[in-house]
Amino acid sequence: MSDQDNTQTSSSKLAPHHNIFMANLESSPTKDRNTSSQNASSSRVIESLHDQIDMLTKTNLQLTTQSQNLLSKLELAQSKESKLLENLNLLKNENENLNSIFERKNKKLKELEKDYSELSNRYNEQKEKMDQLSKLAKKSSAIEQSCSEKLQNMEVNYNSLLESQNLYRDHYSDEISKLNEKIGLLELELSNQNLNYGSDTSSNSDIELNLNKFNDSVKDLKSLETEKDSKLSKIITHSLDELNLQSWLNLYQTNENLISTFAEKMDLKDVLKRNDEKISNKGAVVQTLKKNVQTQVESNNADALSSNNAQDMLPIKMVKLRKTPNTNDSSSNGNSSNNKRRSFYTASPLLSSGSIPKSASPVLPGVKRTASVRKPSSSSSKTNVTHNNDPSTSPTISVPPGVTRTVSSTHKKKRNSMVVHGAQS
């Protein structure tokens, strides 16, 4: 349909030109060639002109044919151009669609890249966690092996302990049964012996009297100690009153001078004022030093008294003695059996004989018999030399043999240190 339309348009365009060309051909002078023979000279010129005209007509026809061909080609080119334009529009639409699709794909690709980066980070984190967990698993496996070995060892030890405990239980149960049998026999023997023993209580009464005497002597010793400590404290206070503190004051003065020189070098005005005030109040400084020494002496005496009282408080208990059996009784089983029973119940053979020997002294059992020796302290020798030898200051009392008077070492050290310090000053 498009080719027919192109041919119609080309024929409609060429029609007026063709009519003009044919009119020119009809009005050409070639028709009057026979009639116009009059002018011979001009005929040649006319013929040449006619030849030229023929040539021009031929060329014109050729040009028309060429123009028709060109028009047909132009129409074909136009049709192709229209087709190409249509194709171009279609391709543009397709290109736009492809661009939109491409943008969508790019967005999706970016999102996928983000997801990939996040997943890669998570993967790395999970990998690190897996490495840590693998290390922990290795450590836990090693610990588990060691614990399993320890558990096995503990099981073996536990089993061995159970076996040994069972063996010990059986052994000691047998021994306990034997001891119960022996105790029953001994109870029967003791019941028989108690029936045969008399009521001799003279030894117990003697021991009670001796204990009462000992308690009275201990009370007297405590009172003497308190009196002596009070006298010593008076002597120490008197010596402190007469004590010369000039060396301490000299040392204090040198320290104050050093502080004042240092303050002058460092431009410390407050320190200089304080030092001037302290130097002006020498009497107050001496009084404070005496008060400090007295408080220290009093505290030392209190500590010594408390330590002496704690050491002197000894527990005294009554010793129960067994009654002596009758040797002439027929129910006794002999001297050897009686001695064994007495040793079993910790009774001494001297006390069980019925009377206390004259050489034995009324002393508690277990107390060592030593001579009461007291070391003279340096403080008493320096302050009052005749104090220990004076009967008025150190009254005597009869102390039972075997009891030693002890003076606490801390009290001696504190008194000695105070008196020596005063002598040095």
From Swiss-Prot:
Topology in the lipid bilayer is annotated as:
Peripheral membrane protein
Show the GO MF annotations: RNA binding
Q: Name one GO cellular component term.
A: endoplasmic reticulum membrane
Low complexity bias: where? 326-338
Positions carrying Phosphoserine are 343, 394
User: Where's it found, cell-wise?
Assistant: Endoplasmic reticulum membrane
Q: Which residues form the signal peptide?
A: none
Lineage, top-rank taxon, reads Eukaryota
For this protein, the record's InterPro entries field holds: She3
Per the record, which residues fall in region Disordered?
24-45, 322-425
- As recorded in UniProt, coiled-coil segments are 68-197
Q: What's in the keyword line of the UniProt record?
A: Coiled coil, Endoplasmic reticulum, Membrane, mRNA transport, Phosphoprotein, RNA-binding, Transport
Pfam annotation, one family: SHE3
Ranges of compositional bias, category Polar residues: 35-45, 345-358, 382-397
**Statement: the UniProt record of this protein carries the keyword DNA damage:** no
Which cysteines pair up through disulfides? They are: none
Gene Ontology biological-process entries:
endoplasmic reticulum inheritance; mRNA transport
Homology family: Belongs to the SHE3 family.
Described purpose of this protein according to its UniProt entry: RNA-binding protein that binds specific mRNAs including the ASH1 mRNA, coding for a repressor of the HO endonuclease. Part of the mRNA localization machinery that restricts accumulation of certain proteins to the bud and in the daughter cell. Required for the delivery of cortical endoplasmic reticulum into the emerging bud.
- UniProt-recorded name of the protein: SWI5-dependent HO expression protein 3
